[in-house]
Amino acid sequence: MEKAIRNFLSQESAGGILLLVAVVLAMLMANSPLAGLYQGFLGTEVQVRVGALDLHKPLLLWINDGLMALFFLLIGLEVKRELLEGALSSVAQASLPTFAAIGGMLVPAGIYLLFNYGDPVTQVGWAIPAATDIAFALGIMALLGSRVPVALKVFLLALAIIDDLGVIVIIALFYSSDLSTISLIIASIAIVGLVALNRKGVTALAPYGVLGLVLWVAVLKSGVHATLAGVIIAFCIPLRAKDGSSPSEHLEHSLHPWSTFLILPVFAFANAGVALGNMSLDALISPVPVGIALGLMLGKPIGVMLFSYVAVKLKLAQLPDGIGWKQIAPVAAMCGIGFTMSMFIASLAFEQADPMFGDLARLGTLIGSILAALIGYFWLSKVLPKKGV
């Protein structure tokens, strides 16, 4: 278990650096003479036609609907494994990160709504600061090496996974619209087929892949966001086969490098390019970016700490062995690194609004995430032992 976690964390740390490079490159291109090339590339129309099925979308939407569905497939596999066998498999293990994650979603959302109260156009972005980017947060923590206790890393990992689960629920409930009955029926049939494969003990991944593709197309056409198809597929793939092997973990390990070194960097590059030249000072300090930045930088640590403290005091949860509040606090600050997950929700929240709101949301996400990363890193570095244990 510990070896698997260490391997996961080391890969995510490398991915965090690549994510940062992708963001910097996107910002440079969006604010240089190459801006037209950057926007034109993302706006390139890509069409896939099979018989009566015709999918015709700009490259940006293929990235957000297609590649991110694979990322959510990976998240679903991780959540299922942790729920059945890992850090969330018992009430005692799951209690503290669960309360922490709930607080870390509610308080940032509340701060955002406080700044955007009474504006129906911008209020839809309330969930943007509720997300945590697991790759970037773990990458920042990994910079401190062996000084960080494994129990603290597991706490952040468990908290971020529960946070991801919350984001999945939020997308399903609040960012789906104009539902197509026929597409939902087809999606339901595909889900029944996936469940039947699981119940029959089918461990070959190919049948799940075929039905999963049908499900993804149906969900894409249904009005429900297509990334949710990835989560459903993940929950249907068996964790353990009769011979003791794990089809779910095999797929998870296969997807990890693709997610870490391709999917997330490509998503970050496609979504982080904010043209600053078109923004006035008033826009930069408007409720959307300020609400998001403060929600991430202040709301996340306040929510995580407040709910964790109350849960421990009420004996609903307990701190990990050897870990105190002075170590939990900077980790709570790191949870404010929303980055790719927050930008993804921003792309959904302001999909039908003026593009300016999407740019402001991404800018607020970048500012809040960078400040949260710096605060969390230096704070944790200060409270940890100077030498590795």
UniProtKB/Swiss-Prot annotation:
It catalyses: Na(+)(in) + 2 H(+)(out) = Na(+)(out) + 2 H(+)(in). HAMAP family: NhaA (MF_01844). Keywords: Antiport, Cell inner membrane, Cell membrane, Ion transport, Membrane, Sodium, Sodium transport, Transmembrane, Transmembrane helix, Transport. It comes from Shewanella sp. (strain ANA-3). One of its GO terms (cellular component) is plasma membrane. It is found in: Cell inner membrane. One of its GO terms (molecular function) is sodium:proton antiporter activity. The keyword Transmembrane applies. Na(+)/H(+) antiporter that extrudes sodium in exchange for external protons. The keyword Isomerase does not apply. This is Na(+)/H(+) antiporter NhaA. It is a multi-pass membrane protein.
